[in-house]
A protein has these predicted regions:
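Structural signal for interior beta-strand "rungs" in well-ordered beta-sheet cores
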Residues: 1-72, 76-79
Length: 80
C-alpha cells in the first residue's frame, strides 16, 4: 500500500495485493488475491475485485471485476 491511498472501513485485501499511490477505495470492498490497483484509481463501495485482476491507473470502478481481468477507463470496462 503506497502513499496517499485511502481505504474505507470493512475493506479486505487478500495476499499479494498491490495498491499504488493515491488510490481511493470506498467501504466494504473485497480485493482478492493478487489484485493490482493502479495509481489514482477510484473504487466505489461494495465492489469485488477478482483474483489476479488489474485496474489501470486513473480508472473509476463502479461494477464488480471478474478473476484474471484487465479493467481501465471511466467508467472502468473490461479490456481483457
Amino acid at each position: 500500500i503506497f502513499s496517499h491511498s485511502f481505504i474505507g472501513h470493512d475493506t479486505t485485501l487478500d495476499h499479494f495485493c498491490y495498491v499504488a499511490n493515491n488510490v481511493s477505495m470506498g467501504a466494504f470492498i473485497k480485493v482478492n488475491e493478487g489484485g493490482y490497483l493502479g495509481m489514482n484509481c477510484t473504487i466505489r463501495e461494495r465492489i469485488k475485485i477478482g483474483k489476479w485482476s488489474i485496474v489501470g491507473m486513473g480508472s473509476v470502478i463502479i461494477n464488480n471485476i471478474n478473476n484474471f481481468s484487465v479493467v481501465a477507463g471511466n467508467p472502468g470496462i473490461e479490456l481483457k
